[in-house]
């Protein structure tokens, strides 16, 4: 009974295209996210017994409350998941369900793609389980619609079993996490909790309270275009300047060469002509000192190039995006200790590792609500090879219920 609607709920959610748009200036960045909140999630939240369900058009958050039914459980706990999906085709998502996976390749629909344990050895962790995959033409959207489905399913179970005692619960579904702005307008006053959890992690047991600190870097290169036949000592090729800048960054400090606590510079876009070019980077690191050092390094490279050129032709724009939430959460580890205790009671081994990325919790933690991250089940996220285990989603439901009953 507890999980009866979990799979159908998840399938219903992922079939709705809620891809965010990094070039949009609205909140949410796409109309589909607001429509998803208002036409699908809000009525369902009300139907399963959440109270004071309301949508804030300013920040795109849909929030509901389940009051405590035991006054001795005095903590207030929040659960957060994001509605948007990543920068990959999300139109006409057509999930396929693999019952009792027995190993080997999984052909993704009628496409030429397959999930191969040689390429994706994480498949070997799911023998005997029910897997939900893509058809090879879209992403799945388990990031983070598995989290939404898990929260909804846990709330539905609690309201259907009033004899199960629980604390005050707040639920929030927000926009635009994948483009890094989802929590920018989050209203703490509308989410009065002692701490919260984002249900936005990956495999079973993930419990995370360390994220990258993140910055966006835009570098503009100003060239001077003249006819190539008479270009000697006159032309300044902006594209060559961009290449020169990139080559001055440490070659091994890129995503494909780093893991664990190692930071990186990641070139995400390069456009231009001889006259003008533009390079987009993201900068990531865990430690505050090394994060700041990376930003200083790019500034110094630009200054050095400009000095050599004799004029300012390399223009740097740096914007911090979010910070490592460890700095906030380690001051009070209650949320982590509670989650560890609940997982261990459920025979789930907590896997406490840094997130090589960020969550909405990164920003919300710095707003005053410690918000670590818990597994939601997704694997190979952000692309056609994404999949999720139904059994892992069920365990996430168990963790949510355990947290609010133990508070």
Curated annotation (Swiss-Prot):
GO terms for molecular function: metallopeptidase activity; tripeptide aminopeptidase activity; zinc ion binding. It is found in: Cytoplasm. It comes from the Bacteria. Binds 2 Zn(2+) ions per subunit. Keywords: Aminopeptidase, Cytoplasm, Hydrolase, Metal-binding, Metalloprotease, Protease, Zinc. Its cofactor is Zn(2+). The keyword Coiled coil does not apply. CDD domains: M20_peptT. Its EC number is 3.4.11.4. Disulfide bonds: none annotated. Zn(2+) 1 binds at residues 82, 143, 200. Zn(2+) 2 binds at residues 143, 178, 382. One of its GO terms (cellular component) is cytosol. InterPro entries: ArgE/DapE_CS, Bact_exopeptidase_dim_dom, Peptidase_M20, Peptidase_M20_dimer, Peptidase_M20B. The active site is at 84, 177 (proton acceptor). It catalyses: Release of the N-terminal residue from a tripeptide. GO terms for biological process: peptide catabolic process; proteolysis. Belongs to the peptidase M20B family. Cleaves the N-terminal amino acid of tripeptides. This is Peptidase T. It comes from Streptococcus pyogenes serotype M28 (strain MGAS6180). The lineage of its organism: Bacteria, Bacillati, Bacillota, Bacilli, Lactobacillales.
């Amino acid at each position: 009974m507890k999980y009866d609607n979990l799979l159908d709920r998840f399938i219903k959610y992922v079939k709705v295209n809620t891809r965010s748009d990094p070039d949009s200036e609205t909140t949410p960045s796409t109309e589909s996210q607001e429509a998803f909140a208002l036409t699908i999630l809000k009525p369902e939240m009300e139907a399963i017994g959440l109270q004071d369900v309301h949508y804030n058009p300013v920040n795109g958050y849909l929030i509901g409350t389940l009051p405590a039914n035991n006054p001795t459980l005095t903590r207030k706990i929040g659960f957060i998941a994001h509605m948007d999906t990543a920068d990959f085709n999300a139109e006409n998502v057509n999930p396929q369900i693999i019952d009792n996976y027995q190993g080997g390749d999984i052909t993704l629909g009628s496409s030429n793609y397959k999930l191969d344990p040689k390429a994706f050895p994480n498949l070997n962790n799911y023998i005997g389980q029910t897997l939900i995959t893509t058809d090879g033409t879209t992403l799945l959207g388990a990031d983070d619609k598995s989290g939404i489905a898990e929260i909804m399913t846990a709330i539905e179970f609690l309201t259907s079993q009033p004899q199960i005692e629980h604390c005050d619960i707040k639920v929030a579904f927000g926009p635009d996490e994948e483009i890094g702005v989802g929590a920018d307008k989050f209203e703490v006053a509308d989410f009065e909790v002692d701490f919260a959890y984002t249900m936005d992690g990956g495999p079973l047991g993930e419990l995370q309270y360390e994220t990258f600190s993140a910055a966006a870097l835009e570098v503009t290169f100003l060239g001077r275009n003249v006819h190539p036949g008479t270009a000697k000592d006159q032309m300044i090729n902006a594209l060559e300047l961009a290449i020169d800048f990139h080559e001055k960054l440490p070659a091994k400090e890129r995503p494909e060469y780093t893991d664990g606590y190692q930071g990186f510079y990641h070139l995400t876009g390069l456009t231009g002509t001889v006259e003008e070019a533009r390079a987009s980077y993201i900068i990531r690191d865990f430690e505050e000192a090394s994060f700041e050092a990376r930003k200083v390094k790019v500034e110094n490279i630009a200054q050095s190039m400009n000095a050599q050129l004799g004029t300012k032709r390399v223009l740097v724009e740096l914007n911090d995006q979010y910070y490592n939430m460890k700095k906030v959460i380690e001051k009070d580890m209650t949320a982590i200790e509670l989650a560890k205790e609940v997982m261990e009671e459920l025979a789930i081994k907590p896997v406490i590792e840094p997130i090589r990325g960020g969550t909405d919790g990164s920003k919300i933690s710095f707003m005053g609500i410690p918000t670590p991250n818990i597994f939601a089940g997704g694997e190979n996220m952000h692309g056609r090879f994404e999949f999720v285990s139904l059994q892992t989603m069920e365990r996430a439901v168990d963790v949510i219920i355990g947290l609010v009953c133990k508070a």
